[in-house]
Regions:
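Bacterial N-terminal signal peptides that target proteins for export
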Residues: 1-9
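Cleavable N-terminal signal peptides
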Residues: 11-13, 23
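N-terminal signal peptide c-region/cleavage motif recognized by signal peptidases
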Residues: 18-20
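Contiguous segments within soluble domain cores/interaction surfaces
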Residues: 24-104, 108-131
Length: 131
């Protein structure tokens, strides 16, 4: 009987291993990437970030972005910041912002996010180039 129980437990473990949803995830299992890295310089620039779960390659929906900062740290000007505001997006896993970029060059959008099912806060920096 013990051998039967062990065999059933092993079979159940193999069945669960084949599911598409990750059983355990980590903050580094997500990638934040610019939809378009080159954006227009000036008022009303549109920035879009795609969040992807690396192991599955699928977009991540329902992310809560609770702290954002937009600065020129890629060009060694951390103190140069820009006003920005979240905008609605209809594309799964894409999070949009409207920004007032005051200078051409590299802009870093720094994000802190709560990802559904993830215990830890996920942090990322997405770089855009204003032209």
């Amino acid at each position: 009987m013990t051998a039967t129980i062990r065999a059933l437990a092993a079979a159940a473990g193999l069945a669960l291993a084949g599911t598409s949803a990750p059983a355990f995830s980590a903050p580094n299992d997500y990638t934040f990437e610019p939809v378009k890295p080159d954006v227009k310089n000036g008022t009303g620039s549109e920035l879009a970030v795609r969040i992807v779960h690396k192991p599955t390659g699928k977009p991540v929906e329902g992310v809560v972005l609770f702290r954002t900062r937009l600065d020129m740290s890629p060009d060694s000007m951390d103190e140069m910041t820009a006003k920005h505001a979240a905008q609605p997006s209809k594309e799964p896993g894409v999070y949009k912002f409207r920004a007032d970029l005051t200078m051409a060059g590299g802009w870093a959008l720094k994000l802190m996010a709560k990802v559904p099912g993830e215990k830890e806060t996920v942090q990322a920096t997405v770089v855009f180039r204003a032209k």
